[in-house]
Amino acid sequence: MTVDLHDFVATVEDYPEPGVSFRDISPLMGDGVAYKQAVDAIADFAKHLNVDLIAGPESRGFIVGSPLAYAMNIGFVPARKGGKLPREAVSASYTLEYGGVNELEIHKDAIKPGQRVLIVDDLLATGGTINATREIIEKLGGIVAGVAFIIELESLQGREKIMKAGEVPFLALMEY
């Protein structure tokens, strides 16, 4: 049984600020069939990429990446917000969609040189968190094997920003 994943995305107008249509995947995560379908679709995309690890930025990248890593029987690497990891980490900064700067970090020993990593997140907006995650993976000697999202907000041109950093296989299950 397949479902239309669009039916499981709630749109919240004027959140987090006026003029923004926030796409909330909470209903998708709350429905076992839709959630499994989304994870399985990304796993199907990833199986041809010879992926060693899944990486996801905090926090919804964890929600997509953890079940994906489990389904593929590979490890998951969290890209945490700055200052959240207890051991030596490598970091990168990025500009927030609504202004300001943030930082992501990954433990220094989480990715070995040459490992192929798929970066996943719930939603692609400007591409800042993905490019920061990519920068860290590459600093650690990893190879970004591709990127995958449940939703892409096309008007924010995140895909173009990701590809400007280097072409990689790309998947978005839904575009808005």
Swiss-Prot record:
Subcellular location as annotated: Cytoplasm
Keyword list, A-Z: Cytoplasm, Glycosyltransferase, Purine salvage, Transferase
Pathway stated in the Swiss-Prot or TrEMBL entry: Purine metabolism; AMP biosynthesis via salvage pathway; AMP from adenine: step 1/1
An example molecular function term from Gene Ontology annotations: adenine phosphoribosyltransferase activity
EC number, UniProt record: 2.4.2.7
Signal peptide bounds: none
Enzyme class, first EC level, given as a word: transferase
InterPro entries xref list: Ade_phspho_trans, PRibTrfase_dom, PRTase-like, UPRTase/APRTase
Gene Ontology terms describing biological process: adenine salvage; AMP salvage; purine ribonucleoside salvage
This protein's GO CC annotations: cytoplasm
Pfam family, one: Pribosyltran
Source organism superkingdom: Bacteria
Entry annotated with the keyword ATP-binding: no
Reaction(s) catalysed (UniProt annotation): AMP + diphosphate = 5-phospho-alpha-D-ribose 1-diphosphate + adenine
Family: Belongs to the purine/pyrimidine phosphoribosyltransferase family.
NCBIfam families, per database record: apt (TIGR01090), PRK02304.1-2 (NF002633), PRK02304.1-3 (NF002634), PRK02304.1-5 (NF002636)
Subunit comment: Homodimer.
Its biological purpose: Catalyzes a salvage reaction resulting in the formation of AMP, that is energically less costly than de novo synthesis.
Family annotation (HAMAP family): Aden_phosphoribosyltr
Name of the featured protein: Adenine phosphoribosyltransferase
